[in-house]
Amino acid sequence: MKIKFFIKRTLIFIFILVTFLTYIHGYNEPWYKNAIFYEVFVRSFADSDGDRVGDLNGLIDKLDYFKNLNITALWLMPIFPSVSYHGYDVTDYYDIHPGYGTMEDFENLIRKAHEKNIKIILDLVVNHTSSRHPWFVSSASSYNSPYRDYYIWSTEKPEKNSNLWYKKPTGYYYALFWSEMPDLNFDNPKVREEVKKIAKFWIEKGVDGFRLDAAKHIYDDDSKNIQWWKEFYSYLKSIKPDVYLVGEVWDNEYKIAEYYKGLPSNFNFPLSDKIMNSVANQKDLGIIEFLEFERELFGENNTDFADAIFLRNHDQVRVRTFFGGSIDKSILAGSIYLTLPGIPFIYYGEEIGMEGSKPDEYIREPFKWTDDMKSKYQTYWIIPRYNLPGNGIALDTEEKDPNSIYNHYKKLLEIRVKCRALSNGKIERIKTQDRSILAYKLELEDEKIMVVHNLNRIENTFNFNNEIKEKDILYIRNAKTEKNKIILGPYSTVIVKIP
């Protein structure tokens, strides 16, 4: 009898222990905490029907490209009907841009992406609509329109921000970004309900979340913005508990931290600048100290924050162009942010070294599948200025070169998937006398990783306390190890497991 009682108690203890360990090992951790995102401009990516405009079926055909690169989630830039090429002036929130395909194509994309364990989030642009959206057309037509209060109107032109008010026969309307993108009036409860309805529609189609365009501009008041996003996020979680929202709050770290009161994730613009400028100056400008400070700051407002890290996006000069065409510096910048905790967002073409600068169209040029640009999937909706036929910037040339940006990214992402410390570990700077050496360690449970970069164009030496064994080296580029010493070549990176 005593033996049976002992066995029973032991089994109960084991069950409780296993349950506890399963919990603390992140079994219930949100999927996005370990995601690797790829931002894709559908128009420029892959054409399936020969009209030279990228489309959803082209994306479907290229899902294995993402899978092979270890991409686990896609952010689709706007895919709704719109007037402009970029899609940020929406005319219908419940349909697909006809140049991109049909709703059936979209549903097929969601299904096939999910079959390959690739999540999809949409760019949700709700700060404003197109001036040709039926809501605004009606709103501008009459004082008595049921949609009049969907937008912000004034009978007279206000003195404050007068350049942001535009005239119609029925009054002046407010448009922050452009006259043809009038701002919605979120003080109107009907507008807030419309936005929830839109999001619900796409979640029911199978999307996994949204990138929130212009998240800090919904109201001209941060506290009201935060309250709205809190309300919106709470509503979506009631429909889809694991929904992912990431805000575009293009501001300093203090402002971004405030928005963590309402959102689970925000893009880390200041960190991006810190990394890019450090590589450009060949000197660590305090990347890790800054990141540690930010993470503490973000955690004060949201203990479960998910930091969205990146180098550049669709509004900024491309990475390689920023570095004057330098492949080594482009690889180094990628090596840094892809070995930091957070959720990395890769801008399409970054991984093959595409170039581009303002105006915006030329930051969003066609993805080059082959150097001659004759692939059947090649888009050509705009004549490129930077990524021209025969200039060597293309996937096929990158794949063949073992030292290419593409193969470097592929290897780094493979390591990131295997080593969870890189995504979610506690990070700590390893002090060095020379600021051209950036060294840090990441720790998660029993996994410890050390990363060392040489930001300089000249050789450097890094001394470590313990001997570095070959079996513990996860990645080494342009460097070599000698017992407890690393000889770092120009713009080199070493990733190693440590005791």
UniProtKB/Swiss-Prot annotation:
Predominant subcellular localization, coarse grouping: cytoplasm
Q: Keywords in UniProt for this one?
A: Calcium, Carbohydrate metabolism, Cytoplasm, Glycosidase, Hydrolase, Metal-binding
Q: Which GO terms describe its biological process?
A: oligosaccharide catabolic process
Report the co-factor binding details. Answer: Binds 1 Ca(2+) ion per subunit.
**Positions with a binding annotation for Ca(2+):** N127, D183, H217
Q: Which family does it belong to?
A: Belongs to the glycosyl hydrolase 13 family.
Query: This protein is called what?
Result: Alpha-amylase 3
From what organism does this protein derive?
Dictyoglomus thermophilum (strain ATCC 35947 / DSM 3960 / H-6-12)
